[in-house]
Amino acid sequence: ERREEFETLVKELNLNERVHLLGLRTDVPELLKAVEVVVMSSHYEGLSLSNIEGMASGNPFVASDVDGLREITDGYGVLFPHEDDKTLADIILKLSTDEEYRQSVIEKCKKRAEQYDISNMSNAYFKVYQGLY
């Protein structure tokens, strides 16, 4: 609904080479693997599959510190204060220049995403059900 507004802004800021508005996609996991940092800068969010997909991508996951994203990301990915573009830029720069930090974040993100893997979740539920009998 705001696509035209974003396209205009990209042109005005001369970001055509860096910003691509891809629209609705079915190949999200492949796209996430092609980026250096996954950023989710929402104003608000519930439990988001996008959050978990980003953490499972093999890249660092950075999210705004808002309800929903905080609960999944805190302690695994990197949170930045909501609407603080300076801090977001600093985090992206650090992830691009500090390989040890980058790898640490990637490993924690993968570990968190594994907790939401369907086979791990079904095994956990099975153990709970076994404990009831």
Predicted regions: what they are:
Residues F6-G23:
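Nucleotide-activated donor-binding/catalytic signature segment of Leloir-type glycosyltransferases, i.e.
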Residues L24, H43:
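Aromatic "clamp/platform" in nucleotide-sugar-dependent glycosyltransferases that forms part
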Residues P29, E36, G58:
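A short alpha->beta transition loop at the rim of the catalytic pocket in nucleotide-sugar-dependent
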Residues S48-N51, L69:
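Short glycine/serine-rich donor-binding loops of glycosyltransferases
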Residues P60-A63:
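Short hydrophobic beta-strand element within catalytic cores of glycosyltransferases
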Residues V78-D85, K94-E99:
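Conserved acidic donor-binding segment of nucleotide-sugar-dependent glycosyltransferases
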Residues I118-Y133:
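C-terminal alpha-helical cap of glycosyltransferases
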